[in-house]
Amino acid sequence: MSSPRPLLPNWFRFDRRLADISRLGFFTDFDGTLVGLRRDPGAVRIGQSTRRLLESLRARGVAVGVLSGRHLEDLVSRVGVAGLWYVGDHGFSLQDPQGCRRLLVSAPVRQQMATLGQLLQSRLASLPGIRIEQKLATVAVHYRSAAPAAVRRARAVIQKVLAEHGKLRLLAGKKVWELMPAEPVSKWTALAHIVRAEKLCMPRALFFYLGDDTTDEFVFRGMRRCKTAACSVAVGDRRPTAARYALKGPGEVRILLGHLLASCRRHQTR
């Protein structure tokens, strides 16, 4: 994988391309990309300026979506913009712009993951700084506030649980482990569905995807394989990455949103 190029200094290339684009999509991860990372995930909200930019893009006919590992209802409440695509639980839950929701996980699997969450809670409750988050189809083990010794003990417990329970996979993110069903579902499978639904795989279409974490690499690799015109953007200092472009952080993401909106106004892109 080659090093991604900084996107903002190269924006003029995309501005020229947008003059010939008839369909545009903008999709982004949430934590660490659209908003900064916080020690308390419950304190995160997008700012009013970011919300207005997303609303303005959507009003111009741009397909806009936010994809996250968060529970779908939690994600929707924190972004708070109507008419967007929302993907939660790393692709296991989806809400379309009309507000219709779709779950990509069966009731037995949901029950399995609920039981797993209870098991992890019982085994990790004594470790300070370790927090268990039960989601629809996944279980997250957060260790941002834990000391190194507690992190090592938690990792050992998780490895033992994985050995005891089949048909699970583990994703390591930024100060979090995600345990999920071993099913072919990811942010990329959800985004591929959205791309088809929004006709972004047709000629004269272009879509962007921004992300900062290891889970976003599924999307970046998928974008490299697809034949649709797409711009993959790694946010932050994660290297190596399959993304072709890079932004330094949420501050530059807001600048990009402003550039994109200005280009849409200039070229009347829809």
Label each PLM-derived region with a short phrase.
Residues 2-9, 21, 188-270:
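Mg2+-dependent phosphoryl-transfer enzymes with acidic/Ser/Thr/Gly-rich catalytic loops
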Residues 5-22, 74-79:
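Short amphipathic alpha-helices and their capping/turn segments at secondary-structure boundaries
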Residues 17-39, 66, 191:
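Asp-based phosphoryl-transfer active-site loop
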Residues 37, 44-135:
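Active-site phosphate-binding/coordination module
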Residues 70-89, 149-169:
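Substrate-recognition/cap helix-loop segment adjacent to the acidic, metal-dependent catalytic center
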Residues 89, 96-114, 118, 173-203:
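Substrate-recognition "cap/lid" segment bordering the active-site pocket of phosphatases
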Residues 130-148, 167-180:
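Charged, glycine-interspersed solvent-exposed loop segments at helix/strand-loop junctions
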